[in-house]
Amino acid sequence: MGLIFDLDLTLVDSSIAEKYRKTGDWRKVYQLIEKFTVYDGIYDLLTFAERLKVPIVIVTSSPSNYCQKVINYFNFKISNLVCYHDTKLHKPHPAPLSLAVNNFFPKAKEVISFGDRVIDIDASKAAGLISVACFWGSKEIEILNGSNPNYSINHPIEAIKIIQHYFG
């Protein structure tokens, strides 16, 4: 059993730094981390998973230095992470998710993957994972819904029912 989360616009609203992330101005992005916000319900969701002893891995297309800064700033309790430089191929390719499963959930029968973009859902499905489209931070809701995820949710608290169904 295991959970995989995308970072930006799934766990945290980092939209204030989006233009700097796209241009690779990481110094400016780091300065803005304190202005990011954790979506309502995320801490409850992560605490619930922790109580069930379900390991959590963040898989992101961002560099590890950035990811670690965000995790530390918001005190996310996660098991591990897979970042941009950990694989040669990136989402929507399943390589980052497959790396997470093989390294951190090698005996897992079921892994649930949460993301806000079509590339998250496509990568999850290609890796054979249970895919959950997260609408609260998504900028592409219509096409995200059209990507045929296993589940679609509007609020992080809705993820608790999915986790209970598989791991509860």
Question: Residue locations for each model-derived region?
Answer:
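Conserved Lys-Pro-Asp/Glu-containing loop-to-beta segment of HAD-superfamily phosphomonoesterases
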Residues: 2, 94-121
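Acidic, Mg2+-coordinating phosphoryl-transfer loop and its flanking beta/alpha structural elements
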Residues: 113-152
